[in-house]
Amino acid sequence: MTNKIIQQLEAEQMSKEIPTFAPGDTVVVQVKVKEGDRSRLQAFEGVVIAKRNRGLNSAFTVRKISSGVGVERTFQTYSPQIDSLAVKRRGDVRKAKLYYLRDLSGKAARIKEKLS
């Protein structure tokens, strides 16, 4: 019985519309940032290097290079802190987890674009 209640609550919280994306895609995540009494949106653009599909507990990791330093950020897919998610570019990769990109830099870290 409690299982049905939990499923119902999770279904309500997962009502947010999220575009389909996969590892290798370049995405722009608009994150709500609260500074003092005001709040604003902060864009985080990078390549999805990992995706974890677990219903309400789903998450994805985005990697970008900021002034020569690699920055990774893990987002909960259905978090209220995420305002919007947009896919800028589809990547053509063969692996589900792109952790090898951490060791690559410059042109070697590029990902081919999926043509379709």
From Swiss-Prot:
Cite the Gene3D superfamilies for this sequence: 2.30.30.790
> Which Pfam family would be a valid example here?
Ribosomal_L19
GO-annotated cellular components: cytosolic large ribosomal subunit
Q: Does the keyword GTP-binding apply?
A: no
GO terms for biological process, alphabetical:
translation
Q: Which UniProt keywords apply?
A: Ribonucleoprotein, Ribosomal protein
A single GO molecular-function term is: structural constituent of ribosome
Q: Determine if Ribonucleoprotein is one of this entry's keywords.
A: yes
Q: What family does the Swiss-Prot or TrEMBL record give for this protein?
A: Belongs to the bacterial ribosomal protein bL19 family.
Tell me the function of this protein.
Answer: This protein is located at the 30S-50S ribosomal subunit interface and may play a role in the structure and function of the aminoacyl-tRNA binding site.
Q: Which PANTHER family match?
A: LARGE RIBOSOMAL SUBUNIT PROTEIN BL19M, RIBOSOMAL PROTEIN L19
Q: How is this protein named in the record?
A: Large ribosomal subunit protein bL19
Source organism per entry reads: Pseudomonas entomophila (strain L48)
